[in-house]
Amino acid sequence: MGRGRVELKRVENKINRQVTFAKRRNGLLKKAYELSVLCDAEVALIVFSNRGKLYEFCSTSSMLKTLERYQKCNYGAPEGNVTSKEALVLELSSQQEYLKLKARYESLQRSQRNLMGEDLGPLSSKDLETLERQLDSSLKQIRSTRTQFMLDQLGDLQRKEHLLCEANRALRQRMEGYQINSLQLNLSAEDMGYGRHHQGHTHGDELFQVQPIECEPTLQIGYHQGDPGSVVTAGPSMNNYMGGWLP
């Protein structure tokens, strides 16, 4: 009984996906080798993993020569105004630039994974020390940047505090000025009221001042002969003294 048809789709489990990739990659490299040996074919195989790691196989001594042959067959002969030698030099230069960029890309990918704590197994002790120094330098730079940011924020807050203190001082001076003016107005009003009250008392004292009574130096006591019930009034004549008491 044969195997059933396997549905081709992405393996969701990360571990299973890595295992499947390793098995299929090894099988693919083996098939390429067998094809080159059995059929005397020129085979070049390039595989990049999902993490950017390169796997390659070439049946000849140089991958670059196989790629040059591929470009010649795929893109055709160069233009008429360009000689074959110049075209070859241009292709070689392009291939070298491509290889440099590829190596740079792979190096950056490895560095990124190492900084994230991945793929540390192949690293030597010296590489790990170098990575540790890089991380320490990065941490120092991050802390320095954070400290400078906090100092800038502190400076801004201090400037705002100074402006608020100046505004508060100006408001306090204005309030003190208002209080002094209000106190002066109250004192002026009290002085005016006291002056009117004192003037009224003085005028009342003048109204109710006791006038001196003029009196004669002599006093007569008795009755007139004509009117026994009437009191004898005082007069200037000495002959009238006590006239009512005489027979």
From Swiss-Prot:
Keywords: DNA-binding, Nucleus, Transcription, Transcription regulation. It holds the Pfam family K-box. Expressed abundantly in the seed coat and to lesser extent in young buds, carpels, petals, and stamen. Coiled coil: none annotated. Residues 1-61 form the MADS-box domain. One of its GO terms (cellular component) is nucleus. InterPro entries: MADS-box/MEF2_TF, MEF2-like_N, TF_Kbox, TF_MADSbox, TF_MADSbox_sf. GO terms for biological process: positive regulation of transcription by RNA polymerase II; regulation of DNA-templated transcription; tissue development. Signal peptide: none annotated. Transmembrane segments: none annotated. It is found in: Nucleus. Residues 91-181 form the K-box domain. Probable transcription factor. This is MADS-box transcription factor 1.
